[in-house]
Regions:
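Short, glycine-/small- and polar/acidic-enriched structural segments
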Residues: 38-200, 204-207, 219-233, 240-253, ...
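Ligand-binding pocket segment of bilobal, Venus flytrap-like solute-binding proteins
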Residues: 101-103, 203-243, 262, 294, ...
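Conserved C-terminal helix/tail region of periplasmic/extracytoplasmic solute-binding proteins
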Residues: 352-432
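Short glycine- and hydrophobic/aromatic-rich loop-to-beta-strand nucleating segment
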Residues: 141-142, 258-261, 265-266
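Secondary-structure end/capping motifs
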Residues: 269-381
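N-terminal secretory signal peptides
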Residues: 1-13, 20-22, 27-28, 36
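Stable alpha-helical elements in mature extracytoplasmic
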Residues: 56, 65, 88, 184-187, ...
Length: 432
C-alpha cells in the first residue's frame, strides 16, 4: 500500500498511518492480489459470463434461473452461449467492456494457457483467475461404431491394430477434442498413450466444438472423440457410436471445468467476485441434490440454453450409463459431481497436474515454473472467503490446497510435490 505523507504530519498521525498500512499489508498477504471488504456489497451489479452447451455449465444456468445471482447482489449477470472454446477465449480477450465476456465456464487448463499467452493472438498474455471448479467427472471418450468389434473400453491398445490397418489402406485416423491443451485433449491423449498409441504420431488430432461432435461422427469425420455430456449420451441414443470409457474411469474424481475470470475484473471487483462465487456455490449445491436432477435436466435442455432433449441429458446425470456397446450400468458413482467430495474447490494440486500434462505434450516449456504459475492464477482464497460468508460446513472446506497423490487407471501415480518424477515415468510424450 502506498502512503503519501505531508511535510506537516505529526508523530501520532505517522504512527496511526503506519499501523493502518501494516493492517492492510496483512490483509494483502491473507488475500493476494485483492482484499475483501468485510461488509461492503458488490462493486458492480453484474458480470458477463460465457458457457458452452455442456452439462457441467449447469451451475451458472441454475444460478441465473433460480435468482441466486440476484440474491447475492448481482441482478444484472449475463450468461451467454459461446459457439466454441475458441470463441470463449476470444471473447475473454475482448472483455465485457468491449462486448466480450468477463468470465466463463471454461476448461480448467485454458485460463493458464491464456495467462501465459500460449493460445492467444500474437501470444499476448491475458491475466486470468480461477475462482472455483465447476464439476468433477462427467466426460467420456466415445468411438465410431465401426470399431465395436475391437471390444475397446479402458484399454485403448485394442484400437491399435484397427487404426494401423486404416492407415495402411490409405485412410486417416482422426480423433477429436475440443481445445488444444484443454481437459478433453488431455483425457484423450492420456487414454491413447496408456494403450501404446502416440497421439502425435499414430493419429491426427482435430478440434471440434462440443455441440458439433455427434454430427461430425455421423458423417465419418472422426474415429473417436472426447467431450463432456450430454454429447456422448446423445451419440449412443442416436446409434452413431459407443462410449469406450467415462473419464472417471481414467481418474476417479478428476477435476474438469472451472469458473475462470479475467484477473483485471477480479482485482477491480473483489467483493463482486466473492458474491459471484457465493451464488455459484449455492447453485452447485442445488445441482448436487439427487432430488433436483430431473428439474435440472429440463432447465438446461431448454432451447435458450442447450436445446437438447432431456433424454440425452438425464441418464448419465443420474449415473445411469448405456455405453452403447452392450454395457449398461445403473447408479454408478461416475456421474458428474458439482459439490460432493470437494468438487467445487479448486485444488492447486489439480492445476499442477494440468500444467504438467501441458508440459508433457509440448504446450508449455519443460522449464515452466508450474508452482509459481498456479499460484498466480488459482484464487482459491476467494472460494474460501465465499464459503465462510455462506456458512459452509467446515467438513466441506478442504484443509489444504492439495488433494495429495492421485492414482490413474494404468497405475501411474502423480505427486503434486514432484511433477518431474511423474513426467519422467511416462514413456509416450512430445519430444523435448
Amino acid at each position: 500500500m502506498k502512503t503519501i505523507l505531508s511535510n506537516g504530519i505529526t508523530r501520532r498521525s505517522l504512527l496511526k498511518t503506519t499501523a493502518t498500512a501494516a493492517m492492510f499489508a496483512a490483509v494483502k498477504t491473507a488475500f493476494p492480489s485483492g482484499a475483501f471488504a468485510a461488509t461492503a456489497g458488490p462493486e458492480v451489479t453484474g458480470v458477463k459470463l460465457g458457457y458452452i452447451a455442456l452439462t457441467d455449465s449447469a451451475a451458472l444456468i441454475i444460478a441465473k434461473e433460480k435468482g441466486l445471482f440476484e440474491k447475492h447482489g448481482l441482478p444484472d449477470v449475463e450468461v451467454t452461449k459461446q459457439a466454441s472454446w475458441g470463441a470463449t477465449r476470444d471473447n475473454l480477450v475482448l472483455g465485457g467492456a468491449a462486448n466480450g465476456i468477463d468470465g466463463a465456464h471454461i476448461l480448467s487448463p485454458m485460463p493458464y494457457l491464456m495467462h501465459t499467452g500460449k493460445v492467444t493472438q500474437n501470444n499476448v498474455p491475458v491475466p486470468m483467475a480461477i475462482l472455483a471448479r465447476l464439476n468433477c467427472d462427467g466426460q467420456a471418450i466415445s468411438v465410431a461404431k465401426e470399431y465395436a468389434g475391437t471390444g475397446v473400453q479402458l484399454d485403448a491398445s485394442k484400437l491399435k491394430a484397427a487404426f494401423e490397418k486404416k492407415k495402411a489402406d490409405g485412410g486417416d485416423v482422426k480423433v477429436a477434442m475440443t481445445f488444444p491443451g484443454g481437459t478433453h485433449d488431455l483425457w484423450l491423449r492420456y487414454w491413447l498413450a496408456a494403450g501404446g498409441i502416440d497421439p502425435d504420431k499414430d493419429v491426427s488430432t482435430i478440434v471440434v466444438p462440443p455441440p458439433q461432435m455427434v454430427a461430425n461422427m455421423k458423417v465419418g469425420n472422426m474415429d473417436a472423440f472426447c467431450v463432456g455430456e450430454p454429447w456422448n449420451e446423445q451419440l449412443v441414443n442416436q446409434g452413431v457410436g459407443f462410449t469406450a470409457a467415462s473419464t472417471g474411469e481414467l481418474w476417479k474424481g478428476h477435476p474438469e471445468k472451472a469458473l475462470g475470470l479475467r484477473a483485471d475484473w477480479v482485482e477491480k471487483n473483489p467483493n463482486a467476485a466473492k458474491a459471484l462465487m457465493m451464488a455459484v456455490m449455492e447453485a452447485q449445491m442445488w445441482c448436487e441434490s439427487t432430488d433436483n436432477k430431473d428439474e435440472m435436466a429440463a432447465i438446461v435442455g431448454k432451447r435458450q440454453w442447450f436445446n437438447v432433449p432431456v433424454k440425452d441429458i438425464i441418464g448419465r446425470l443420474k449415473g445411469d450409463i448405456n455405453y452403447g456397446n452392450g454395457r449398461v450400468v445403473h447408479g454408478t458413482d461416475l456421474s458428474m459431481k458439482f459439490w460432493a467430495n470437494g468438487a467445487s474447490y479448486p485444488f492447486k494440486s489439480h492445476d499442477v497436474w494440468f500444467m504438467a500434462e501441458n508440459v508433457r505434450w509440448g504446450k508449455l516449456a519443460p522449464d515452466t515454473d508450474i508452482k509459481a504459475l498456479v499460484n498466480e492464477v488459482n484464487r482459491e482464497d476467494i472460494w474460501r472467503a465465499a464459503a465462510a460468508d455462506l456458512g459452509v460446513a467446515a467438513a466441506d472446506i478442504p484443509a489444504t490446497t492439495s488433494r495429495g497423490k492421485e492414482t490413474f487407471f494404468d497405475g501411474k501415480v502423480f505427486d503434486p510435490e514432484n511433477p518431474s518424477a511423474y513426467l519422467d515415468s511416462l514413456s509416450i510424450r512430445a519430444a523435448s
